Amino acid sequence: MSTAAKQNRSTSRVSKKKTAAPKEGAAKKSDKGHKYEYVELAKASLTSAQPQHFYAVVIDATFPYKTNQERYICSLKIVDPTLYLKQQKGAGDASDYATLVLYAKRFEDLPIIHRAGDIIRVHRATLRLYNGQRQFNANVFYSSSWALFSTDKRSVTQEINNQDAVSDTTPFSFSSKHATIEKNEISILQNLRKWANQYFSSYSVISSDMYTALNKAQAQKGDFDVVAKILQVHELDEYTNELKLKDASGQVFYTLSLKLKFPHVRTGEVVRIRSATYDETSTQKKVLILSHYSNIITFIQSSKLAKELRAKIQDDHSVEVASLKKNVSLNAVVLTEVDKKHAALPSTSLQDLFHHADSDKELQAQDTFRTQFYVTKIEPSDVKEWVKGYDRKTKKSSSLKGASGKGDNIFQVQFLVKDASTQLNNNTYRVLLYTQDGLGANFFNVKADNLHKNADARKKLEDSAELLTKFNSYVDAVVERRNGFYLIKDTKLIY
């Protein structure tokens, strides 16, 4: 018989039933009958040995990272109605926020924070004062757990995947196999979500002492944080995007962003970059280097700071204009912009559009896509033939050479293109600019006219052709799939 069995066996035929002591860290009913009794951040006891349970709003976070062979870590800044930044400029003391440090033995057991303003629920955390600040510690590999709730209608993941919102009491990510919510938590969550929106709409939340202006980046000796607007997302290769950033100081910087790590970055978004360093080796342009623990975080829709910077920071394209004047541009230049209604549309590779569209269920369900490519050739090669006469009765087009000028004129141009996903194959792909139905009519910002007669229009289009086929020039376009072809729409050249 095992030792455990011997210890459990009674020494008498009749013995009193003993109540087993609860396992340390295990959930138990509170005096009010709830499984967990939630505490506000400023009211959590520093002297109690009991585990703490709480809801909080996340305002900043590192990306989960490995500290040694057996441990991963993630550090968050959290607030609630009892502990938050109460002024536009922080006092720099412990009254602005608490920190939450989560530990795990696996990367996937830690939360990935993509957006400031979302809500986290933590069970079984400990509390201590660290450098005068409240620090909650949660060991997920022991007994702690967490769950993330979206403050906006949809989570970042749902927005990326174009998924419908689920119940506002359902977490979009959590550490355990299952996540449940009790009735008493519903009001806590709803009230905190309401407070978070009011807080972010009334305060900057990320105060000016919590980040570095880009015009002072070069003077920084170590890591620093940044708040900036993404002016451009350029697909550098199949795994990496290059972000063009500009902040309120007017400085423009670039940084590399892994697609898998930061799938949520979009042109026009205001982001907080956690932990960047200045690249001393870059001579052609100013660059920020991101570390394995660096994070790029967007803001909830009600954010006052994001709205102000989104309106204030504009792209004057001076860097691109200077690059295009050079014989060889060392900076990638995206020559186009898409209509604002497609701003949140994720980018789809040419590989997916031309090789997987008929087999992928998600792609089959769509007819409008956003894609980025470079142009290797334009057909017809004679610019004068880019505009055709179009007979709407017969639905046939014809050359305008020698034509009287009556009837409808349309652009009929084919771009032979490639992108990072098709870089290594021998194929080129045709993307069409056929404007008979109005799609892409404003792409060139030139009216479709008889180019055999209109020399001014022809010269503008010849200049556009040169830019489109220039090294390091790219097109960011919205395309519509029709009868197996992809036609450009809601896209225009900006140079």
UniProtKB/Swiss-Prot annotation:
Recorded hits in Pfam families, A to Z, give: POT1, TEBP_OB2-like
Q: GO:BP terms for this protein? A: regulation of telomere maintenance via telomerase; telomere capping
Instruction: Give yes or no: UniProt keyword Ribosomal protein.
Output: no
Disulfide bond positions: none
User: Under which name does UniProt file this protein?
Assistant: Telomere-binding protein subunit alpha
Identify the SUPFAM superfamilies for this entry. Nucleic acid-binding proteins
Q: Which family does it belong to?
A: Belongs to the telombin family.
Q: Where in the cell is it found?
A: Nucleus; Chromosome, Telomere
Q: Which GO terms describe its cellular component?
A: nuclear telomere cap complex; protein-containing complex; telomere cap complex
Reported function: May function as protective capping of the single-stranded telomeric overhang. May also participate in telomere length regulation during DNA replication. Binds specifically to the T4G4-containing extension on the 3'strand and protects this region of the telomere from nuclease digestion and chemical modification.
Family annotation (InterPro entries): NA-bd_OB-fold (IPR012340), POT1 (IPR028389), TEBP-like_OB2 (IPR053979), Telomer_end-bd_POT1/Cdc13 (IPR011564), Telomere-bd_alpha (IPR003415)
Query: Which coarse location class describes where this protein primarily resides?
Result: nucleus
What more is known? The sequence of the A (or alanine) version is shown. The S (or serine) version differs in only two positions, and the K version in only one. There may be other versions in addition to the S, A, and K versions.
What keywords is this UniProt entry annotated with?
A: Chromosome, DNA-binding, Nucleus, Telomere
> Biased composition, Polar residues: where in the chain?
1-13
Subunit structure comment from the entry: Heterodimer of an alpha and a beta subunit.
Gene that produces this protein? MAC-56A
Gene3D superfamilies in the record, alphabetically? Nucleic acid-binding proteins (2.40.50.140)
Citing just one GO molecular function, the answer is: G-rich strand telomeric DNA binding
